[in-house]
Amino acid sequence: MILEHELPQGSKLYFDMSARLKRDIESCAIKAFYENDYREIVTPSFAFLEHQGDMFNREIVRLSSENNHQIGLRYDTTLDAMRIVTKRIMRSSTHKKWFYIQPVFSYPTTEIHQIGAEYLGGESLSPVMCLGVSILQTLNLAPYLQISNMKIPFLCAKHSDVDIEVFALQNVGKLLQMEGYMADLVHIKTKQDLQKAILSAPAFLKEELERLLECASYCEYEKTIFSPLLFAPSPYYEDLFFRMFVGNSTLLQGGKYSVEEQFSCGFAIYTDEVVECLLS
């Protein structure tokens, strides 16, 4: 028996102080976005399953249309927004910077509120990353900023005959058993660690390690951690990637990616996690 006060597992309820905080977070982000020439986009909650990236993903909430087309509830706004901008909006607008405030959904009943920014054709991740950092700072939050480069684990796997799954599973124990540069990469945390590693790194890694260092130089943030071997959680992040976290909670993540053959960069703020952090 389902009681009247019960809610589906994974759904979200905000009221009073939590609802006010949620609105304050959104207002803070909106102000920052407009000041940086971003425009808002609201995408449909439903999309054809074939447009959802991995149509075999079991976490997508599925249903059928009246014409028997497979439909999915929005699972990833980055994919949706960039597809709509490149295939539909660009017929009438050449604007490149877009932001959104809307939830995504996953099976069976999980709802995740997000605030995101996407810079279509953005070549440098640094300004986008700094925008995300500044929004959380305005909210008086000081999470750790962790920066990585997905090209580094792929290069290491290629040149060391190590299965990429070792990096994907973050098998630190196995990586530390390897001699030379691999163990050095695991120990990198600070800017000084990274600068030192660049001096002794193999030639095939130097450029990507330097790009990792350069990415952070644009945004001086005290609580910055470098993690060259960190594996990004989203498959379309294949380059520079960053996240901001407190404890086990990720408040923001983003990076450089390619969607619909367009190289872009962006980030998403996880509103639910930020609200919880502000309430604690």
Curated annotation (Swiss-Prot):
Complex formation: Heteromultimer composed of HisG and HisZ subunits.
InterPro entries linked: aa-tRNA-synth_II/BPL/LPL (IPR045864), HisRS-like_core (IPR041715), HisRS/HisZ (IPR004516)
Family of this protein: Belongs to the class-II aminoacyl-tRNA synthetase family. HisZ subfamily.
PANTHER family assigned to the protein according to its UniProt record, in alphabetical order: HISTIDINE--TRNA LIGASE, MITOCHONDRIAL-RELATED (PTHR43707:SF1), HISTIDYL-TRNA SYNTHETASE (PTHR43707)
GO cellular component: cytoplasm
NCBIfam families: PRK12293.1 (NF008946)
Additional comment: This function is generally fulfilled by the C-terminal part of HisG, which is missing in some bacteria such as this one.
Keyword hit for Cytoplasm: yes
Keywords attached to this entry: Amino-acid biosynthesis, Cytoplasm, Histidine biosynthesis
GO function term, MF aspect, one: histidine-tRNA ligase activity
Bilayer-crossing regions: none
Domain of life: Bacteria
Organism lineage: Bacteria, Pseudomonadati, Campylobacterota, Epsilonproteobacteria, Campylobacterales
Pfam families referenced in this protein's UniProt entry, alphabetically: tRNA-synt_His
Function: Required for the first step of histidine biosynthesis. May allow the feedback regulation of ATP phosphoribosyltransferase activity by histidine.
Pathways per UniProt: Amino-acid biosynthesis; L-histidine biosynthesis; L-histidine from 5-phospho-alpha-D-ribose 1-diphosphate: step 1/9
Subcellular location: Cytoplasm
One GO biological process term: histidyl-tRNA aminoacylation
Protein name, as recorded: ATP phosphoribosyltransferase regulatory subunit
